[in-house]
Amino acid sequence: MWKLYVAALPANGWNWIAVWRRNYLAWKKVALASILGNLADPLIYLFGLGAGLGMMVGRVDGVSYIAFLSAGMVATSAMTASTFETIYATFARMRAQRTWEAILHTQVTIGDIVLGELAWAATKASLAGTGIGVVAATLGYTEWVSLLYALPVIALTGLAFASLAMIVTALAPSYEYFIFYQTLVITPMLFLSGAVFPVNQLPGAFQHVTRILPLAHSIDVIRPIMLGSPLVHVGLHIGALCCYAVVPFFLSTALLRRRLMP
């Protein structure tokens, strides 16, 4: 098992850039449609819940509900963009298009490919999260400088969720299995992590579950930054996101090597 992990590591510190660039060049042809697609869902939540439910809710934690919600949607947009890129587009490149098979005939290793795919998913997550943030800043729900401070956390959020989704990609026999991850993990996480309402409104048992969810850690950093509130336990939240980004990377890489190169 140890040899499997070692063999799955990236060959060096730069091969992954070629994988990232390949994905970027392919994406550039459909960039506008891709960006609009990633923004549509969070914007519907933002204006649908924010404008409609916000009239009944009023203020939450001292700010308007739509301002509270906008910060949650920034993190959620990063989560969904990186997750869908990894479980669908990455799986297509690995299985249907057989792009990985062609790449593996070069000096690039499985680890290089996975690292490049994760970096690309984090890039798309950054674009999606920043897009929602730009809308929020334009409408006055956050300051522009606050959005700039939030960008590294948005990117880290994308990297963490891409890394987690890569495990699903490594194990899934076909596209149909991804619906289980979407409905049983991603969707519940949206409502349990404080994206649409405060976590302290949840029952006690659910609040304990929330503490281990990566989206909750992301929101607990992004929301205070965007709303100008004090940051609490920021080191813990960033450390948790780093763990979610790093540990699944090694696990998924080993699983993919065993799957593709038995």
From Swiss-Prot:
GO terms for cellular component: ATP-binding cassette (ABC) transporter complex. It is found in: Cell inner membrane. The chain crosses the membrane at residues 35-55, 62-82, 102-122, 127-147, 148-168, 177-197, 231-251. It comes from the Bacteria. Residues 33-259 form the ABC transmembrane type-2 domain. Keywords: Cell inner membrane, Cell membrane, Membrane, Nodulation, Plasmid, Transmembrane, Transmembrane helix, Transport. Pfam families: ABC2_membrane. InterPro entries: ABC2_TM (IPR013525), ABC2_TM_bact-type (IPR047817), ABC_2_transport (IPR000412), ABC_transptNodJ (IPR005981), Nod_factor_ABC_transporter (IPR051784). It is a multi-pass membrane protein. Its main location: membrane. PROSITE patterns: ABC_TM2. One of its GO terms (biological process) is oligosaccharide transport. Belongs to the ABC-2 integral membrane protein family. Lipooligosaccharide exporter (TC 3.A.1.102) subfamily. The complex is composed of two ATP-binding proteins (NodI) and two transmembrane proteins (NodJ). Part of the ABC transporter complex NodIJ involved in the export of the nodulation factors (Nod factors), the bacterial signal molecules that induce symbiosis and subsequent nodulation induction. Nod factors are LCO (lipo-chitin oligosaccharide), a modified beta-1,4-linked N-acetylglucosamine oligosaccharide. This subunit encodes the transporter. This is Nodulation protein J.
